[in-house]
C-alpha cells in the first residue's frame, strides 16, 4: 500500500516507550477502561455504566473547581473565581447533554438488566451530594445513605459543615460594606439556605451600581449561570428517568420521578432571582 502524507508517520514522533511514560500510562487507561464491568449479558448495560462513570468524572472536576472558587471568594479574590465558575458552567452543559445519550435506552432494554443493579442508585452519588452541599442545598438526613462507609460518611459530614459558595459570597458582600443581617452571617451552615430580605436588598444595591460593585455583580451572574444549569440538569434527569421507567420507584427506594419533581421546586441562590423583580 502506497504511503501518503496523511498515513506516513513523522520521523520525530516518539515510538519507544520502554523507559518513558506514554499517554495510556499518564491517564492510567488500563485501570480506567477495565472498570466497566457489566453484571448482565445485555448489550445496553454498557451504555448505562459509561454514562454514569463519565458523569462522575465530570462531577469530580466540578468539585475541584468549586473548592478553589470558594477559597478565592473567601480570600476576597473574586475575579480569580470567575474562570473556575465559568468552567463549572461548561462542565454542567456536558452533564446536561449526557441525559440525551442515556435517553436512547428504552424501557424494554433497561428491564433486561435493571434487576442486576440491586438497590444501587444515582441517588447515592456522593459527588452529586457534595456539589449540592457546595451550592447551599443541604440536608443532614441524606448522610444516612453513606453510614456504611466510615471515611466517606466523615468526609460528607465535613462537607455539610463547610460554608457553601453562597455563604462565602454573602460574607464577601458584608466585608465590602453591604448591610447583611448578623443572623445570616452567623447562620448554621449545615442547614439549607433560606431567602433573606437583607441579602436581597444587598444584591439590589449591587445591581443598581454595577460600576462600583462590578466584581460582585459578575459573581452574582456566574452563580446564577450555575444555579440555572443545575436546575436544567435536574429537569433533564427527571425527564430521562420518566422516559425509561415511568412512575415506578427508583432502584434505591425513592419514589422516582415524584421525588425528582419535588427537588425541582428547590431554587439555588433565591435572592439572585427575587432581586430581579425588585429592580
From Swiss-Prot:
Binding-site residues for substrate, renumbered to this chain: 48-52, 110, 114, 251
Cofactor note: Binds 1 heme group per subunit.
MF terms (GO), sorted A to Z: heme binding; metal ion binding; tryptophan 2,3-dioxygenase activity
Enzyme class: oxidoreductase
Pathway: Amino-acid degradation; L-tryptophan degradation via kynurenine pathway; L-kynurenine from L-tryptophan: step 1/2
Known function: Heme-dependent dioxygenase that catalyzes the oxidative cleavage of the L-tryptophan (L-Trp) pyrrole ring and converts L-tryptophan to N-formyl-L-kynurenine. Catalyzes the oxidative cleavage of the indole moiety.
Identification of the protein by name: Tryptophan 2,3-dioxygenase
Highest classification ranks of the organism: Bacteria, Bacillati, Bacillota, Bacilli, Bacillales
Recorded name of the encoding gene: kynA
